[in-house]
Amino acid sequence: MKTIGYAIVGTGYFGAELGRIMKEQEGAKIVAVYDPENAETVAKELGCDVETDLDKLCSRDDVDAVLVASPNYLHKEPVLTAARHKKHVFCEKPIALCYADCDEMVRACKENGVIFMAGHVMNFFRAVRHTKQLIAQGKIG
């Protein structure tokens, strides 16, 4: 199985948690993070590099996909940068705060032939995973 290299933009609660979950997944490796406030702390926990420039982050050969978990109003730039560098994108919700930005982001990913996924999923939350385990064990549901 090929290992997919991920970079995380925004290492607050959601970005750090996505990193922790991805670190546990077979075939996935967090290779770098970008965040002006707490990248160092999260990078140390995840065992990855810190990048201080989006273009450098997205131009890395070991990055296949970019997870965008920055504050909502900061989603556009990393999505467009990742698409320009031909990196697949997972973007936390809401992907944009206005239709024009959303349209531009989706269009950029299409034009560059990369997958763009909005993070409308909950299976990364510990409570949801724990509930799934309890159901599988027959303890609930």
Features from the language model and the residues they span:
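N-terminal Rossmann-like dinucleotide-binding module
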Residues: M1-L46
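Acidic-histidine catalytic/liganding microenvironments
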Residues: Q25, R60-D61, F125
